[in-house]
Amino acid sequence: MKLRLGLPKGSLQEKTFQLFKKAGYDLQVNSRSYYPAVNDPELEILLMRAQEIPRYVHEGVLDAGLSGLDWIMENEADVVEVADLIYSKRSQRPVRLVLAVANDSDIREVRDLQGKRIATELVNVTRRYLAAQGVEAIVEYSYGATEVKVPNLVDAIADLTETGSSLRANNLRILAVILESNTKLHANRAAWADPWKREKLLNLTVLLTGALRAENMVGLKMNVPGDRIDAVLGVLPAMKHPTVSQLFNSDWVAIETILNEQQVRDLIPILKRAGAQDIIEYPLNKVIP
């Protein structure tokens, strides 16, 4: 038996492949293939546009897939949300679907969009949002380069943004946030009802979320003389409590902990002054609480 899994092709592909690699899945694909090889005979991977994955999961063509909440909502896909995987092309944070207008536009509030023309890839989501605000507008599908359409072609856009830099570069300002979206592992309901496929998805969830949790974290090991243990532990942050192990035939101990990578630069000199020696920093692939 195999689990048929859809992964996003395009802007999220590289980050997704890196995540799977850290989770223990080595995906190999050439530029023309949509069927990556994977070092797990129980997985069949298909690459496709993130926009399409929820529909194919909903219809049962795929057992499960990775796509954003925005595209699940756009497709009105009736799927099981198995796991939140909060990552995007450049960061580990959600993206936002925003309404944006030109900096010098007279449009100041959402209600000012009444009767205006809006371009977006997420037509259904945008229409539902405007309807909830009591606004009737012309919402048209954008085939790309959405930011450059304001103000000559449309009055506003609804577009995904991670940092807002692309909007600012095109002299646009955010009028409102329609929703926040992040990648979700979602499953077809029949596949989720299958015990073998559900267990496979749950195992995959443990590994993928562990790999995400490990990003920006490192392990730190050091040797500490017995009379400096309290001093070192006093400055050492940890997820819970550091591991302290007695060294063989010695009054020294080995201390090991996991911490945020950003803390390490400033912490290592402090640990050294507190009495730690033989300090080793190492990367992590997965952190499973």
UniProtKB/Swiss-Prot annotation:
Q: Superkingdom, according to UniProt?
A: Bacteria
Q: Which cofactor does it need?
A: Mg(2+)
Its BP terms in the Gene Ontology are: L-histidine biosynthetic process
* Compartments where found: Cytoplasm
GO terms under cellular component: cytoplasm
Protein's pathway: Amino-acid biosynthesis; L-histidine biosynthesis; L-histidine from 5-phospho-alpha-D-ribose 1-diphosphate: step 1/9
Any keyword Transferase? yes
Where is the major localization of this protein?
cytoplasm
Coiled coil region boundaries: none
Function, please? Catalyzes the condensation of ATP and 5-phosphoribose 1-diphosphate to form N'-(5'-phosphoribosyl)-ATP (PR-ATP). Has a crucial role in the pathway because the rate of histidine biosynthesis seems to be controlled primarily by regulation of HisG enzymatic activity.
Question: What's the family?
Answer: Belongs to the ATP phosphoribosyltransferase family. Long subfamily.
What name does UniProt use for this protein? ATP phosphoribosyltransferase
